Amino acid sequence: MSVTASDLAFDQRHIWHPYTSMSRPLPCYPIESASGVELQLADGRSLVDGMSSWWAAIHGYNHPRLNQAASQQLEKMSHVMFGGITHPAAISLCRRLVEMTPEALQCVFLADSGSVAVEVSLKMALQYWQARGERRQRILTLRHGYHGDTFGAMSVCDPDNSMHSLYQGYLAPHLFATAPQCRFDEEWREEDIAPFAALLEQHAGEVAAVILEPVVQGAGGMRIYHPTYLKRVRDVVRVAIKLLLIADEIATGFGRTGKLFACEHAQVVPDILCLGKALTGGYMTLSATLTTRHVAETISNGAAGCFMHGPTFMGNPLACAVADASLALLAENRWQAQVSAIETQLKRELLPLGRCRRWPHVRVLGAIGVVEMREPVDVAELQRGFVERGVWIRPFGKLIYLMPPYIIEAEQLSRLTAAVADAAR
């Protein structure tokens, strides 16, 4: 079915796209199909995808093994409630998750999206302390962080970036430490942890957990910080009052930074781990929140007798089957060479741009490449130019960045980096 001019007019008038004004909507480009690393426009042009559909489609599009997993599961059942029922797809997926994550993380809660995974992690932390008889209700997090758009997740996002002022009185008043300043490739400076440690000491009796994005702060600014900061956070949290550490790896999990999980850069094991995005290879919405048996049993032995959360589509068999197939692909370990090759090429083709005074900073880690401008970019104008060049890149704020599928070829990646370089000029 082709998209007509009438369809686009309907879309513009009636369909509310993410972060888009209904009175002044940004242009939308109709995609009719996708395969490998290319998106097929309705007018026949193809675009090399540099976004992995917001960082999720790590294996590319229309992957035969993921298609097969979805098709086979669809013939059995697309959905069944998860309350009082289980099924092979969920069991196999959770077994893989337990095997590939740190040994301490033994209990898996499946949910609908990354935002919900964060909601689940925050509820776990609050219920954990209630079960222990302590009234700890605040979360300590970092400036420039992003954890999702639902109310609980928003409450631990950067107050300025997430416009907390719009929802004053509704969002919980949490604690925000100064974001780490020491970059990944710089020499570690111990004073970088001081604002975090001071804030935690000041509010030690109130804090239930610390939540952060390990090493890479994603939608809050694509900031790549020193792994030692994460290690020192873990040390401060453990030594001080044994608070729970929540790692939001929704954007970084499953190889994006060059490690399977970004926490591995600092050899840190969190108490709660949030996963999403690439979990299904970008096919369907699904997330997972993993925690230790200690946390799970403490919650279960509390007054409620259980963890108080249960989405309608929890453990959806179709999503679980595709996620299981996606993780099976990762387990074959081709991603390591793929991400390493992407990182090498991004450094070769993007880092020289950092010599220009117009760009405060160009940074690369794993399959992430970021060019930061001095002023906010014109998203609509840049997007139009990118499409004309046959690439799909979605800038935001001051940033033009790439997070391509792992299967991208060198020539395709060069088309993306060349487009970024030209746009930045």
Curated annotation (Swiss-Prot):
Transmembrane segments: none annotated. Keywords: Aminotransferase, Biotin biosynthesis, Cytoplasm, Pyridoxal phosphate, S-adenosyl-L-methionine, Transferase. Pfam families: Aminotran_3. It comes from the Bacteria. Gene3D superfamilies: Aspartate Aminotransferase, domain 1 (3.90.1150.10), Type I PLP-dependent aspartate aminotransferase-like (Major domain) (3.40.640.10). The keyword S-adenosyl-L-methionine applies. GO terms for cellular component: cytoplasm. Its cofactor is pyridoxal 5'-phosphate. Substrate binds at W54, Y146, K277, G310, R394. One of its GO terms (biological process) is biotin biosynthetic process. InterPro entries: Aminotrans_3, Aminotrans_3_PPA_site, BioA, PyrdxlP-dep_Trfase, PyrdxlP-dep_Trfase_major, PyrdxlP-dep_Trfase_small. Its main location: cytoplasm. Pathway: Cofactor biosynthesis; biotin biosynthesis; 7,8-diaminononanoate from 8-amino-7-oxononanoate (SAM route): step 1/1. The record marks Y19 as: Participates in the substrate recognition with KAPA and in a stacking interaction with the adenine ring of SAM. It is found in: Cytoplasm. GO terms for molecular function: adenosylmethionine-8-amino-7-oxononanoate transaminase activity; pyridoxal phosphate binding. The modification N6-(pyridoxal phosphate)lysine is found at K277. It catalyses: (8S)-8-amino-7-oxononanoate + S-adenosyl-L-methionine = S-adenosyl-4-methylsulfanyl-2-oxobutanoate + (7R,8S)-7,8-diammoniononanoate. Catalyzes the transfer of the alpha-amino group from S-adenosyl-L-methionine (SAM) to 7-keto-8-aminopelargonic acid (KAPA) to form 7,8-diaminopelargonic acid (DAPA). It is the only aminotransferase known to utilize SAM as an amino donor. Homodimer. This is Adenosylmethionine-8-amino-7-oxononanoate aminotransferase.
